[in-house]
Structures are given as structure tokens and as C-alpha cells.
Amino acid sequence: LIAFHGQSGDIMFQGAKTNKVQDAFDALNELGFDLGGAGPAVRTSMSCVGAARCEQSCYDESRAHRQVINTFLDDIHRPALPYKFKFKFSGCANDCMNSIQRADMAVIGTWRDNMRSDEGLARKWFAKHGMNELVNDVVARCPTKAIMLKEVKELRTGDAAAHLTSVKVSDTHALEIDNKDCVRCMHCVNVMTGALAHGTDTGATILIGGKRTLKIGDLMGTVVVPFMPLKSDEDYEALV
């Protein structure tokens, strides 16, 4: 019986007799398949589709995934750790891999410069959705109150606006985003995709220790590296 196993992405062979497991293991190895990934070992890791097709991707997830897994491949085959260990790679804070609460080491895409904006798309969005949705679903839901709705004439300019992202939604009103207060949660980008976008100085945040248990619930990972650039070969090598 073969089962494709959910979050781990493994093919599981269930119901084998104990005295035949090693024979099956050896035979599949000879065919070129990797085996292992269960018990107190490095588990099968996962990365989102990311850079292959998603505009929100902040680094090359599959490359980072391969770099890390190739380094620790031997630890996947046989249980050799005190407890299981999982790596997961998400390209942005939407965290499609659930890495923040389902991985011992999570690599989540982020950026450290100002957000980008597109006035044409912002005006189209506003014309379609209106003021109520802009206020209730964008401005009011910013977790750090980094977004303000202003009249165009009140927008800050010059050196005082170096840390701001401003975009007109109409001839009279505009959004002003204080990038110093932004926590890169992706909510406004998700709601106004295209009109707002992540910055160009991208990389990843690395977290340790996320897990999910029935007794306690989600325990989010702890940030150990707030920002790591992931652009050059040296950057990806630094992951390991």
C-alpha cells in the first residue's frame, strides 16, 4: 500500500513485514530513491512554489531548500537525533508552508527597504472597491497602524518622507505608509496586490523553534536572524 503523506510530502509504504523492511530499503536505494525521514531524524523539508510563479517571493526558495537539504541529507536517512527536526521555506510572510509554527527552522522571505506602489493600479482598486473597503480592510487592519489615509495636499515630501511610501488612490486622497513601523505582514499587499508591493532589497528572516502540539497549541518560532540577504552564491552558502 502506497500513501502520499500530507505535509511531509513523502511516499509511504505501509504494511511491510518487519523482517523485510531492510531488504525493501536496500532495493529502493539501488533504484536511486532517497529513503528515511521518519523518527528522530531530519524530516522531509518543504518550500513554497515561490519564485517559480509567485510575485510575492522574496528569495529563491527552491535553491535555499536544496542548499540546506543537500548539506544535511545524511541526517535524513537514519534516526540519529534526540528528536525530529524540520526545515521549511516560505517566500514571504504569507507563509504558505506554515513554517512559523510547523518547523524547527523556518526561513521566511522579507524585505528591508521601502514598499513599492503603483498609482495606476491603486486608482483602479479604489474605483472598484471604494472608500469604506479602503478604510476598513486596509488602513484599519494594519497591525502597527503604519498606514494613514490622507488628503493629497497633506502628503509629506522631501527628506521628511524618505521612509514613507505614498500612493494616490484618487485626485483627493492617498495612502501614506510609514515603513519604519511596517512589520511586513503582507496584509495590505494581499488586499491591494499590484497597487502595493514588497521592496526590492529582499532576503529572509530565520526563526527557530516553532511547533504545534495538541496539549498546548501553536508555539511560534523565535527570530534569530531578522534579515539575511539571499542573492549571491555566498549568501545561500551562509545558510548552512
Protein language model features and the residues they cover:
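A structural signal for small-residue-enriched, beta-sheet-centric alpha/beta enzyme cores
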Residues: 116, 128, 136-139, 143-144, ...
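Short helix-start
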Residues: 151
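Small-residue-enriched alpha-helical segments and adjacent helix-cap loops
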Residues: 1-135, 141, 145, 155-159, ...
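Non-catalytic, well-ordered alpha-helical scaffold segments
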Residues: 22, 201-203, 237
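Short coil/turn segments at secondary-structure junctions
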Residues: 52-56, 226-227, 231
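Long, compositionally biased charged/polar accessory segments in the mid-to-C-terminal portions
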Residues: 232-236, 240
